[in-house]
Amino acid sequence: MKIAILSRNSKLYSTRRLIEAGRKRGHTVRILDPLRCYMRIAADGFSLHYKGKPITGFDAVIPRIGASVTRYGTAVLRQLEFMGTYTPNPSDAILRSRDKLRAHQLLAAQGIDMPVTVFGDNPDDTQDLLSMLGPPPHVVKLNEGAQGAGVILTEKASASRGVVEALRGLYANFIVQEFIGEAEGADLRCFVVGDKVVAAMRRQAAEGDFRSNLHLGGTAAVAEATEQEQEVAVRSARALGLAVAGVDLIRSRRGPLVLEVNSTPGLEGVEGVCGVDVAAAIVVHLEQSVRRSAG
């Protein structure tokens, strides 16, 4: 099988592991910087070039598209899709996952529970908007933030209003959510491949913080996701159209709540903590999916 990996940096851990896993299973693997890809779109067909040469014959493509190049990267991925290349995470699914508001709407439509979320545009509605959420603490999130950036905890109603008004002044899109205190700064990252959770880890926020992201100083340990948590994680990925996803849950009194569905989850943390060859699981999924589509 001929596999392309859309990545701007071949030295990143996740990219290197996917290369290793693909080649170990006998496949040809090539890294394509999405920003060096360019395309021709016409009624008579789609074509893609890379550094002066046409790109053809790929059976599968693994998108590792950073948030800063989402628009162009997904356009390149979409071109490959139209050219008949299989991808576990289609371009439209990535776009759904990176718009927090849209993602939460889609999850809620499938009956998947999450922290109560509110969204509004007009400053005149701020007080009523926050009253729909209930008393603070509140969590304010940039709609397209990643890795814990643009996430603010407000402990007073006046602080919530101030942050909301400041973000509106910057023309930033954001959502506001209820704060789940019983989670105590911990979440569960479930790594979904296909129709199952292949690994799970519990992440704990650093002292004085409520964000559990590892690169912000959080710690992680291997975890055993319950059957309910695994079901919620798989349903969440499926609701957005993703076959490979990092689904972040928190454990609450009313059950698992989905915080986010990440379409480009890093492998380093989960492989290091859990000792699971997630990269190989992704490649096996590609093999099975391409075989079925050829079938």
From Swiss-Prot:
EC numbers: 6.3.2.-
Recorded GO CC terms: cytoplasm
Binding residues annotated for Mn(2+) 1, in chain numbering: D248, E260
Signal peptide coordinates: none
Short name of one Pfam family: Rimk_N
Keywords: ATP-binding, Ligase, Magnesium, Manganese, Metal-binding, Nucleotide-binding, Protein biosynthesis
Key word Ribosomal protein present: no
Superkingdom of origin organism: Bacteria
Binding-site residues, Mg(2+) 2: E260, N262
List of residues binding ATP: K141, E178, F179, D187, R211, S212, N213
Cofactor note: Binds 2 magnesium or manganese ions per subunit.
Any one GO biological process: translation
Cofactor(s) for this UniProt protein: Mg(2+); Mn(2+)
Residues the entry annotates as binding Mn(2+) 2: E260, N262
Binding site for Mg(2+) 1: D248, E260
Key word Metal-binding present: yes
Enzyme superclass (EC): ligase
Start and end residues of each ATP-grasp domain: 104-287
InterPro entries, sorted: ATP-grasp, ATP-grasp_RimK-type, ATP_grasp_subdomain_1, RimK, Rimk_N, Rp_bS6_RimK/Lys_biosynth_LsyX
Family: Belongs to the RimK family.
PANTHER family: RIBOSOMAL PROTEIN BS6--L-GLUTAMATE LIGASE (PTHR21621:SF7), RIBOSOMAL PROTEIN S6 MODIFICATION PROTEIN (PTHR21621)
Stated name of the protein: Probable alpha-L-glutamate ligase
Designated gene of the protein: rimK
